[in-house]
């Protein structure tokens, strides 16, 4: 398997001096792609058997920002994220019912109907959160032959064995098993609570292929039995197919570090393939200090949270926390995020409003402040994608711009630089200002309509004042106040905010 070809037109050699935290090395290290100008990223995607929850949102937004930042710094990024639609069993191990099949029985649907239903549900949620679509979105069921081929390679090299129609990875044959998580093989043996199945040589061996029971609906022919692939093999096979040997970044949630990512490495490397060069993991969400999980019943779906909060407020809350930090989700955190996002978006709207009739020229002092904040933002993103510091830079810029805007007219050139900085850093990198036409831009499209309507309302109020119809002008102001809109009279005319 080879690295995808880069054309001469798109190949670049940026050198932004990025450092990232590599889980394998357990420290921050310089990021040097295997191919200059190109980054291959693989993210473990969802198992599509139910609606996505906020834990999925944390992971997807975190790696979306990393992808956006790499693009901002000049890299061509191929971003692959899989869809698990077979092989993920209820206990995340080798026994139990397939999660999709269990849901299919509950909803009285075919497993593939369940997969399609929640596949599209997942992407509606991601679109709302302004998460860019992956370059490639491979589904496990569409890559059965690639998985079988990798299993055959492992058997041939003596790292896997067939037993009663199933195939297992022989962990004792691969001494490096456990190097990502730091778990020693002997410690794993002492700590295991799984009884050794007759068909397993060792309780720590994991399934590469499972023989299907008669009631199992999802099944394919293989050299060993009619069955289905194990959960771990799909990611090894598909990442190598679409990103090639030694691709750059493999990402996922911290909960996947063991056993899933550990198994991926063992499968790929034992078969003779050079696997991922950097490993990145996002941390978890907590609610009331407890880890959010379905087993605890304290999880919230993305759809439910979007009924209460603007999608960009949810995204703002997520990027305000470092991807390697725990993010606490509560009403206070959402209220703070709503205020913070409102401050940024209102400043951008005010800049765009002022541009309509801004005087020519620029403000050298303010231009210097804008440039300094851009540098500050980019330095934060170079340092292991430190989004909290990057957001703080945007707030610093916001304060400086509002001070200048309140002091009087600002030159067009400077306003354009400020607008471009907001759109580039807050929009293109952090994804907080959605592109026109995307699902996430709907609320912002609505905001544009509100801006236009408010211009008309303020002009009507000004006409009342000019005609000395002060009662009518005050009534308009009071009505707006009841709707949560504050009108401020300044020397440059009336301004409004929510």
Curated annotation (Swiss-Prot):
HAMAP family tied to this protein: Cys_tRNA_synth (MF_00041)
Motif ('HIGH' region): 46-56
Matching PANTHER family: CYSTEINE--TRNA LIGASE, CYTOPLASMIC, CYSTEINYL-TRNA SYNTHETASE
Family to which this protein belongs: Belongs to the class-I aminoacyl-tRNA synthetase family.
Species in which this protein is naturally found: Deinococcus radiodurans (strain ATCC 13939 / DSM 20539 / JCM 16871 / CCUG 27074 / LMG 4051 / NBRC 15346 / NCIMB 9279 / VKM B-1422 / R1)
A Pfam family assignment: tRNA-synt_1e
Domain of life: Bacteria
Reactions accelerated catalytically: tRNA(Cys) + L-cysteine + ATP = L-cysteinyl-tRNA(Cys) + AMP + diphosphate
Any Gene Ontology biological process: cysteinyl-tRNA aminoacylation
Bound cofactor: record note: Binds 1 zinc ion per subunit.
InterPro entries attached to this UniProt entry: Cys-tRNA-ligase, Cys-tRNA-synt_Ia_DALR, Cys-tRNA/MSH_ligase, CysS_C, Rossmann-like_a/b/a_fold, tRNA-synt_1_cat_dom, tRNAsynth_Ia_anticodon-bd
Matches recorded under CDD domains: CysRS_core
Recorded GO MF terms: ATP binding; cysteine-tRNA ligase activity; zinc ion binding
Keywords of the record: Aminoacyl-tRNA synthetase, ATP-binding, Cytoplasm, Ligase, Metal-binding, Nucleotide-binding, Protein biosynthesis, Zinc
Residues reported in the UniProt entry to bind Zn(2+): 44, 235, 260, 264
Protein name, entry field: Cysteine--tRNA ligase
Keyword flag Ribonucleoprotein: no
């Amino acid at each position: 398997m080879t690295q995808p070809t880069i054309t001469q037109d798109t190949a670049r050699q940026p050198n932004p001096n990025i450092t990232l935290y590599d889980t394998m090395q357990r420290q921050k290290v310089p990021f040097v792609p295997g191919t200059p100008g190109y980054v291959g990223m693989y993210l473990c995607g969802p198992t599509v058997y139910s609606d996505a929850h906020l834990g999925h949102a944390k992971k997807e937004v975190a790696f979306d920002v990393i992808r956006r930042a790499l693009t901002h710094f000049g890299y061509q990024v191929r971003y692959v994220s899989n869809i698990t639609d077979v092989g993920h069993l209820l206990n995340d191990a080798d026994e139990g019912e397939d999660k999709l099949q269990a849901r299919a029985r509950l909803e009285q649907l075919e497993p593939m109907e369940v997969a399609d239903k929640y596949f599209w549900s997942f992407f509606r949620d991601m679109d709302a959160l302004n998460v860019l679509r992956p370059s490639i979105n491979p589904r496990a069921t569409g890559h059965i032959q690639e998985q079988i081929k990798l299993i055959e390679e492992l058997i041939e090299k003596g790292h896997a064995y067939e037993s009663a129609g199933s195939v297992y990875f022989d962990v004792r044959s691969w001494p490096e098993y456990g190097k990502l998580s730091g778990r020693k093989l002997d410690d794993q043996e002492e700590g295991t609570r799984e009884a050794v199945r007759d068909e397993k040589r060792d309780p720590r061996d994991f399934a590469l292929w499972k023989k299907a029971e008669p009631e199992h609906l999802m099944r394919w022919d293989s050299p060993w039995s009619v069955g289905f692939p194990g959960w771990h093999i799909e990611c090894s096979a598909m990442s190598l197919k679409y990103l090639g040997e030694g691709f750059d970044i493999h990402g996922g949630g911290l909960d996947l570090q063991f056993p899933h990512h550990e198994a991926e490495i063992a499968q790929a490397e034992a078969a003779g393939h050079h696997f991922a060069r950097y490993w990145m993991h996002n941390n978890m969400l907590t609610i009331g200090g407890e880890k959010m999980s379905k087993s605890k019943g304290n999880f919230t779906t993305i759809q439910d949270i979007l009924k209460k909060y603007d999608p960009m407020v949810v995204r703002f809350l997520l990027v305000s926390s470092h991807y390697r930090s725990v993010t606490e989700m509560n009403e206070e955190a959402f209220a703070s995020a709503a205020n913070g996002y409102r401050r940024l978006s209102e400043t951008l709207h005010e800049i765009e409003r002022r541009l309509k009739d801004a005087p020519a020229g620029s403000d050298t002092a303010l231009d210097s402040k804008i440039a300094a904040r851009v540098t500050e933002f980019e330095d934060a993103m170079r340092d292991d994608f430190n989004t909290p510091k990057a957001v703080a830079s945007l707030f610093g810029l916001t304060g400086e711009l509002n001070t200048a805007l309140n002091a009087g007219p600002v030159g067009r050139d400077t306003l354009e630089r400020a607008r471009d900085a907001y759109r580039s850093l807050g929009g293109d990198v952090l994804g907080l200002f959605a592109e026109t036409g995307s699902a996430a831009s709907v609320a912002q499209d609505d905001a544009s309509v509100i801006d236009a309507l408010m211009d008309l309302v303020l002009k009507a109020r000004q006409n009342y004042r000019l005609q000395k119809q002060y009662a009518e002008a005050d009534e308009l102001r009071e009505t707006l106040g009841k709707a949560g809109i504050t009108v401020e009279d300044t020397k440059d005319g009336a301004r409004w905010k929510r």
